[in-house]
């Protein structure tokens, strides 16, 4: 299974200056629960934005066109095609971004695990690609109000590509 996981604002914004726009405790817990024990694929800048480097208990794959690229705790591939070819059939693989990696993976993904943040940031320079609603079937939603650990309301939304099994 190839899944995309992302938190996006009302205007599809996902980041600014190579940082997340919102730090939502429940979203981070969900992210950890879904990705732990699985393979994660991300672009170089996304990897470099991780405060502690490679995420533990996951196979970290970084996409970089630099032939000499090396990132501690991660495997490096030049393209999404090469990275996917290095995964096992039936393996759960999650794409973590950034913007261009999401755009490339969108046509191949089987599932979307999205957090729809009910806010629009003042500034953003990275955006999630348009979602063609006809391609996706909404399987589950879970709304969360803002609270002391989550500064804005948001909704978890899980989608399966039309024609795929649940």
Task: Name every feature range the model reports, one short phrase each.
Residues 5-39, 44-166:
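Flexible, gly/pro- and Lys/Arg-enriched active-site loops
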């Amino acid at each position: 299974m190839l899944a995309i996981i992302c938190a996006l604002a009302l205007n599809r914004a996902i980041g600014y200056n190579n940082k997340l726009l919102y730090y939502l405790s429940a979203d981070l817990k969900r992210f950890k629960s879904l990705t732990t024990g699985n393979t994660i694929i991300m672009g170089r800048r996304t990897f470099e934005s991780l405060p502690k480097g490679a995420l533990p208990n996951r196979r970290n794959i970084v996409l970089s066109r630099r032939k000499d690229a090396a990132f501690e705790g991660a495997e490096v591939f030049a393209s999404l095609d090469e990275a996917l070819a290095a995964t096992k059939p039936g393996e759960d693989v999650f794409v973590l971004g950034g913007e261009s990696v999401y755009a490339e993976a969108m046509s191949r993904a089987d599932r979307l695990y999205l957090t729809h943040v009910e806010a629009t940031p003042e500034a953003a320079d990275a955006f999630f690609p348009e979602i063609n609603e006809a391609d996706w079937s909404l399987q589950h939603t879970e709304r969360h109000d803002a609270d002391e650990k989550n500064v804005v309301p948001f909704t978890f939304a899980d989608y399966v590509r039309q024609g795929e099994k649940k």
